[in-house]
Swiss-Prot record:
Role according to the record: Multifunctional RNA-binding protein that recognizes the K-turn motif in ribosomal RNA, the RNA component of RNase P, box H/ACA, box C/D and box C'/D' sRNAs.
GO function terms (MF aspect): ribonuclease P activity; rRNA binding; structural constituent of ribosome
Alphabetical list of Pfam families matching this protein: Ribosomal_L7Ae
Alphabetically ordered keywords of this record: Cytoplasm, Ribonucleoprotein, Ribosomal protein, RNA-binding, rRNA-binding, tRNA processing
Source organism superkingdom: Archaea
Organism in which the protein naturally occurs: Saccharolobus islandicus (strain L.S.2.15 / Lassen #1)
Name the record gives this protein: Large ribosomal subunit protein eL8
Main location: cytoplasm
One GO location term (cellular component): cytoplasm
Keyword RNA-binding found: yes
Family matches, as PANTHER family: RIBOSOMAL PROTEIN L7AE FAMILY MEMBER
Cellular compartment(s): Cytoplasm
Length: 127
């Protein structure tokens, strides 16, 4: 299956697992926003520390604006393979296309590591 058009880089599975763990920890000890509307607002306001986007969103237009907006606002973003897994990490009973970590809480070190690895991955793909 080919990647969606909004997926700008490949995320290794170990990193995707860390992303979901960071979302879980931030939900418990910090602050997150769930869903594309809330995530978009957090990015536009410059509040998001990390944006998480699911790769299996249909139609793609729901989240296609997020990578561009994040780049414009210089907010790091990362992908996870499943909107269902992202929804569960957010504490939801349903899937969610995207989420934003506003305050990482106990996940701060994990978020810092994720941002560093994402920047390394993006550096390789953009050169």
């Amino acid at each position: 299956m080919s990647k969606a058009s909004y997926v700008k880089f490949e995320v290794p599975q170990d990193l995707a697992d860390k992303v979901l763990e960071a979302v879980r920890k931030a939900k418990e000890s910090g602050k997150i926003k769930k869903g594309t509307n809330e995530t978009t607002k957090a990015v536009e306001r410059g509040q998001a520390k990390l944006v998480v986007i699911a790769e299996d969103v249909q139609p793609e237009e729901i989240v296609a604006h997020l990578p561009l907006l994040c780049d414009e606002k210089k907010i790091p973003y990362v992908y996870v393979s499943s909107k269902k897994a992202l929804g569960e990490a957010c504490g939801l009973q349903v899937a969610t296309a995207s989420a934003a970590i506003l305050e990482p809480g106990e996940a701060k070190d994990l978020v810092d590591e994720i941002v560093k690895r994402v920047n390394e991955i993006k550096g390789k793909t953009s050169s």
